[in-house]
């Protein structure tokens, strides 16, 4: 496919990293595609909070913390034409991007200036799920380190041990990852 930028004569390259060799990603110069690793929390009202950014005092990737990737909120649109399915992605609402990314919508209906996606699969520490580095995923596997494997039906109860507004991977998390793959590598 061709991006809108390509149609304007602006060509960007995204090459995946291989092993320890970082790939090229021209997209990161744009806010929509630039991520910052953070510690985050979700309050009792369902609002996301960035508690610390990587490099700041108090930030850690290990232990009883939630590690995520924060980026600016975005809007999207999808056109299904006879020739192709066209995805639109923008930092603002337009005719082509009428829908906010779900993870950008606050519980009160306002649009957050940022959205957060977990960086790591949830692992178990003392019976509570944490998205932190080095944990075996609590995904139903029988690994000794997983302690309390989680089933599909038990995910809601398990994630709510952190608070009533925490959840596991959602269809919107998957849509975001797929959308980034389509935009950058299609």
Please provide the spans of the model-predicted regions.
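Conserved hydrophobic ligand-interaction patch in extracellular adhesion modules
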Residues: 1-78, 141-186
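Hydrophobic structural segments
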Residues: 69, 85-88, 103-104
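Short, solvent-exposed loop/turn elements at domain surfaces
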Residues: 77-83, 124-128
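Long, low-complexity, polar/charged, intrinsically disordered or flexibly structured peripheral segments
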Residues: 83-86, 117
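Short aromatic-cysteine micro-motif
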Residues: 90-186
